[in-house]
């Protein structure tokens, strides 16, 4: 059974088009907009922007 609460699981997908992704949680009350973080993509072997997608 899923937990009720403000935190939801989101998928951070690489903008490099490699298909690599991270999963993380975000507080939907505090962060209404989609997340954009610069993280390391091991497939592309460099830091790229990861954007939030639906799980």
Curated annotation (Swiss-Prot):
Keywords: Ribonucleoprotein, Ribosomal protein, RNA-binding, rRNA-binding, tRNA-binding. It comes from the Bacteria. Transmembrane segments: none annotated. GO terms for cellular component: cytosolic large ribosomal subunit. Coiled coil: none annotated. GO terms for molecular function: rRNA binding; structural constituent of ribosome; tRNA binding. The keyword RNA-binding applies. One of its GO terms (biological process) is translation. Binds the 23S rRNA and the E site tRNA. Part of the 50S ribosomal subunit. Contacts protein L35. This is Large ribosomal subunit protein bL33. It comes from Deinococcus radiodurans (strain ATCC 13939 / DSM 20539 / JCM 16871 / CCUG 27074 / LMG 4051 / NBRC 15346 / NCIMB 9279 / VKM B-1422 / R1). The gene is rpmG.
